[in-house]
């Protein structure tokens, strides 16, 4: 059948949006790859999506206001760039404030890496993140597990990385954390915790901060953020060996991004 000029134009118009979608997808994938290659989190775990393996625990220890959440968000964004789902559990911090952390860190990361901060790139990451909030006084690990189970079993959201931000380690947690360890292995999740320490507090018997010492055996990785003068040092307490060329890591006080002190 002979196509008229009008028919050919109409067919081309239908193909054009599809071609643009493909081109846009490739461009977004290229930007993601650039961010992964230039992400400062790779100093901790290489260019993999996470420092931990399935079923493992990691802790970021520091005093209040030093940068625990900022480092957590960098780890989460690295996982999201690899298209792996993240659940960020925040205690006593509303969804909009947690989301603001992600927007600010993503903006700093994009600018530092020289990658255009396009709205499409940001929007492509959001399906891989779920923010869950609790009031600290009503929170319990079993309650969190119940909500996570509902999400996973109904296939609403299946996380590979779980962040628990704001849980107090000043109270006994061994039994609850042991149960969560089993839960994370069952569902193939890696779990990161922020652990708040206190000024002028003696370390535990192992030399680790008191908040970690009673449950240290449950953690495969522990990182401490230590203010020294105007710098915030990133110190590995357990489970990681930094590359020789990146052995001195700090948090940039302006952007709160991990950076190589010697760079």
Regions found by a protein language model. Give the residues of each.
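Pre-Walker A adenine-sensing motif
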Residues: 39-51
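Phosphate-binding/switch loop-helix module in NTP-utilizing enzymes
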Residues: 130-186
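Conserved P-loop
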Residues: 71-129
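Pre-Walker A (Motif I) flank of P-loop NTPase domains
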Residues: 53-58
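Structural recognition of the conserved hydrophobic beta-strand(s) that form the central parallel beta-sheet
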Residues: 165, 190-199
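P-loop (Walker A) phosphate-binding loop of NTP-binding proteins
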Residues: 63
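Conserved lysine of the Walker
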Residues: 68
